[in-house]
Amino acid sequence: MAVGTLEHYESDGIIILPVFPNWAMLGAMLALKGPAALPWISNAFKATGVMVKIQDELAGEIYPDNYLYTSSKNPSDQDKKRLAKGAGIVRQVLKRAGASEDSIMELKPSGAHPSSCCRIGEVVNIDLETRVENLFCCDASVMPESLGLPVVWTAVSLGKRLSKHLDSQIN
C-alpha cells in the first residue's frame, strides 16, 4: 500500500491504492455477495484489486461485552458519497485501461483501522497515558480525527515516541 493517489483526491477525503485481499479473505468477500459471485471465484487468480479509502466521519460506538469490546460504525451519508465517488473514479480508470463493465466487481466496504476512539486530550494525555496510572494506549485510536490514510507509519512513530518516554521514566 505504498503507492496511491493522495495528491489527486486528498481534499475530497479519498485515496485510491492498489490492494488485493488474500485468497481466504477474497473467498469470504465473494461468498458474502451471494450466488451471483460464484463465477468470479474460478477467475479470482486473474483479478487485481484497487482500494478506495476515505477519511470517514467520526461516529460509531464501542460496546463493553464481558471480556471483549465490540464496535459498530455505519457509514454516514458523507462517507457513502466519498466511497461512491472513489469507486466511480476506479471504474472509469479500469474502463479506460480496457476492462469491460461486466469484468468489474465492487465489493462492499469493510472497516479497518478504527481510529479516534481514545483521542489525545480526551482519553489519553500527550504521553498517551490514560486516567489509569501506567496504562497507555498507542495505536490509531489516539488520533484526533480519522486519518483517511494507512496508519502503519503513524502507529510505528507513536510507538517509538512512547517507548522513549517510558524509557526515560525508568532511567
Question: Language-model segments: what does each one mean?
Answer:
Residues 81-146, 152-156:
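A glycine-rich dinucleotide-binding beta-alpha-beta segment and adjacent secondary-structure elements
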Residues 57-63, 97-101, 167-171:
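Short helix-capping/linker segments at secondary-structure and domain boundaries
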Residues 43, 149-150:
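Composition- and surface-driven signal marking solvent-exposed, interaction-prone regions
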Residues 1-88, 124, 131, 144:
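FAD cofactor-binding and catalytic pocket of flavoenzymes
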Residues 153-169:
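An active-site-proximal "capping" alpha-helix that borders the catalytic cofactor pocket
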Residues 1-9, 139, 164-169:
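Glycine-rich loop(s) and the adjacent beta-strand/alpha-helix scaffold that form part
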